[in-house]
Amino acid sequence: MAIRILLSAKLGELRMTQADLARKTGIRPNTINEMYHELCDRVNLEYLDKICTALNCDLTDILVRIPDE
């Protein structure tokens, strides 16, 4: 099983930059960048809440579970 972070697609859809999201959420730009490029193996739940609020979306819009084949 894998969890994909769809932050890059959502930001592109909204024409928002990583820097814009960092400013709106107060999350460090490096953390946003790691999530954007799917380089993190864990995510702070508070950050997910802040991101969903800033992007006006649900958790399922930025996270997806890919089952094992």
Residue ranges of model-derived segments:
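A short, Lys/Arg-rich alpha-helix, primarily the initiator
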Residues: 1-19
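The alpha-helix within a helix-turn-helix
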Residues: 11, 22, 52
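Short alpha-helical DNA-recognition segment
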Residues: 16-34
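Helix-turn-helix DNA-binding elements, focusing on the entry/boundary residues of the two helices
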Residues: 18, 45-48
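DNA major-groove recognition helix of helix-turn-helix
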Residues: 36, 47, 66
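Hydrophobic micro-packing sites on short alpha-helices
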Residues: 47-52, 62-63
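Short C-terminal boundary/hinge segments that cap the last helix of small helical domains
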Residues: 56-69
